[in-house]
């Protein structure tokens, strides 16, 4: 079906899913690449960094983009969707991304925190 043009979707383009103890397992993006290698087609993602989910949240809640902040640890999904959607982005360095990633990324977070506990200082 996919080879014949059937539209298919993925949740996110993440390559690895962090696990307890610092281990990683393949995530949705890895699986999508596997399917692409076989079919020549890559999915349309509706999770981050796609705006679909955030647009739905805005529509359903009535919040304006300037009333929303996205908090995340991945530059290429969490911070990217915030950048596309003109909402505040807060990068936490306790996950995947590093300060070096921020320097080399096309998208930049509005705020960088060492970990999520620092968010209370912003409130």
What residues fall within each predicted segment?
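Asp-based, Mg2+/Mn2+-dependent phosphohydrolase catalytic module
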Residues: 1-123
